[in-house]
Amino acid sequence: MIILGIDPGSRKTGYGIISKQGNRLIHVDNGAIFTQSAKDFPERLEKIFTGLSEIIAQYRPEVVAVEDVFLAKNAQSALKLGQARGAAIVAAVNVGLPVHEYTAMQVKQAVVGTGRAEKAQVQQMIKALLNLPEVAQEDASDALAVAICHAHSAGINALFKNVR
């Protein structure tokens, strides 16, 4: 299963693609879509949508996992972040992909084992889990963490489904 993890942001939207093969997680790609703050906000949203649409077309993930961000420095930041999340979600839904949302605490719990882990701990664990030569850039690392969270959650959900 190919999973696209997304860490939405109005300036940088991180993406991370992993492949889950049995119990193995394999790194496929990661990076970030950068928008120019000098541009009008609708143009920035369009860049996020278009960039993620191109990534989806290239890697053909089976599922998308998005970080559900609920904290922001101020109301305006929260609104912009919500709109960036919307652009990311629409890019996935537009081509029929299922979208799953995870809180930062759920992501940290799945990757490190505690929902109160520090960012550096999460980054080091991602490096180890995916056998990366170095720690990924921050937004990409967060997106890889979201993808790993979904990989773990999907496995647990499948077990519970089979129990019923």
Swiss-Prot record:
Active site positions, chain numbering: 7, 67, 139
Keyword Hydrolase attributed: yes
Cofactor note: Binds 2 Mg(2+) ion per subunit.
Gene3D superfamilies: Ribonuclease H-like superfamily/Ribonuclease H
Record-level Gene Ontology MF annotations: crossover junction DNA endonuclease activity; DNA binding; magnesium ion binding
Matching InterPro entries: RNaseH-like_sf, RNaseH_sf, X-over_junc_endoDNase_Mg_BS, X-over_junc_endoDNase_RuvC
Catalytically driven reaction(s): Endonucleolytic cleavage at a junction such as a reciprocal single-stranded crossover between two homologous DNA duplexes (Holliday junction)
Residues reported to bind Mg(2+) 2: 67
Subunit structure: Homodimer which binds Holliday junction (HJ) DNA. The HJ becomes 2-fold symmetrical on binding to RuvC with unstacked arms; it has a different conformation from HJ DNA in complex with RuvA. In the full resolvosome a probable DNA-RuvA(4)-RuvB(12)-RuvC(2) complex forms which resolves the HJ.
Family the entry assigns: Belongs to the RuvC family.
Protein name per the record: Crossover junction endodeoxyribonuclease RuvC
Taxonomic lineage from the root: Bacteria, Pseudomonadati, Thermodesulfobacteriota, Desulfuromonadia, Geobacterales
Gene: ruvC
